Amino acid sequence: VNAKPTPLSGCPGGIEHIPHASADSALLVFIPLPPGASLAALRLLALCCEPQFFQRLRVEQQIGYVVSCRYQRIADRDGLLLALQSPDRSPVNLLGCCKQFLRELTLCDETAFSVLRQQLAMQIRSPMNASATAVAALRQRYGLPVLTPQAVDALQHDEIIALWREMTRHRRRWRVLFTG
């Protein structure tokens, strides 16, 4: 873990093709947390996105066999990671599916927001395994945001909406890797 990253350090935006022998297409889209945004808001947004992404792209559209949307830390950046793998869709089509999902995302209402906030708070308050404890210690040591129960309790519904808008509007920050 390095010191506080600059907006382009470690994980610059852009699109990169990764050569691979498989005939399948695979796509990773990493949307970094904007500077100054709340880690708690990002984690809650990920909880909101995860089941909807799977339902829409895996169950309803049957995109392929890898369909995932979740919080992830990559190259010293917190963000939202969308992953798709398909035997019959092109990388361009997969990227279009991700963009469409984010445009049409049904953000949680106040009731669902409260449920997700409680779920996230319970995750934080539950005993951590050794790996999670080590990650939390490293984040604290390097002055990186640490997810605390207080930050989760203080979250407001409007923060999630604002974060979603910010992350989806600034696609030049996105890091896209693909095969196929």
Language model: regions and residue ranges:
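Generic recognition of flexible, low-complexity loop/linker segments
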Residues: 15-17, 54-55, 68-71, 161-166
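A structural supersecondary motif
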Residues: 26-32, 46-86
